[in-house]
């Protein structure tokens, strides 16, 4: 069997006011920036490229949030946190509008169920990695686990 997985990256990008970068996608409405990893790219290269293409800004990746998988289409999404470092908010073919929003406003604007679930994980995942699997239509979470990130105090490194 030939592998057929697609891998994407996305980020919760924040500014100095702790506002969240949102793009208005013609396909899914309001969401955080991200997209598919192109052949030969690293996770970091893909994420920085996607944010630049969709929002016109530069970022520094600051953390890992988690992974989710569409069990119906073999799509894997990897989520990160990032800090805005420069550039002007600029719409593109992939984003009709680009804004900074408070976390509360972001939760209100995002209506696509998968995007909202991932944002909840991004906002609450301090020190944990979120791993979940879902089916898209209707959106149903089939597995949802939050695991501590990194080594824990009860794990020996010797």
Tell where the protein language model's regions lie, with residue ranges.
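Conserved N-terminal beta-strand and adjoining loop/helix that marks the start
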Residues: 1-20
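Short loop/turn microsegments at loop-to-beta-strand junctions
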Residues: 8-9, 42, 96
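A structural signal for short, well-ordered beta-strand segments
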Residues: 11, 64, 80-82
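Conserved hydrophobic "DFG−1" position in protein kinase catalytic cores
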Residues: 13-14, 22, 82, 100
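Conserved Nudix-box catalytic region and its N-terminal flanking loop in Nudix hydrolases
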Residues: 15-53, 148-158
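Nudix hydrolase/Nudix homology domain
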Residues: 30, 96-158
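A short coil-to-beta-strand element that immediately follows conserved catalytic motifs
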Residues: 58-66
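Active-site-adjacent beta-strand/loop module that shapes the phosphate/pyrophosphate-binding cleft
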Residues: 69-89, 99, 103, 117-121, ...
């Amino acid at each position: 069997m030939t592998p057929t997985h697609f891998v994407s990256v996305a980020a919760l990008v924040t500014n100095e006011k702790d506002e969240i970068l949102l793009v208005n996608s013609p396909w899914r409405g309001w969401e955080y920036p991200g997209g598919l990893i192109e052949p030969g790219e690293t996770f970091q290269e893909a994420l920085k490229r996607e944010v630049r293409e969709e929002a016109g800004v530069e970022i520094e990746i600051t953390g890992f949030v988690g992974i989710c998988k569409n069990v119906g289409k073999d799509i894997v999404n990897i989520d990160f946190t990032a800090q805005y470092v420069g550039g002007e908010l600029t719409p593109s073919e992939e984003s009709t509008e680009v804004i900074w929003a408070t976390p509360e406003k972001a939760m209100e604007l995002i209506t696509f169920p998968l995007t909202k679930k991932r944002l909840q994980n991004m906002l609450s995942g301090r020190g944990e990695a979120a791993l979940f699997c879902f089916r898209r239509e209707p959106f149903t979470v089939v597995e949802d686990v939050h695991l501590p990130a990194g080594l824990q105090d009860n794990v020996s490194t010797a």
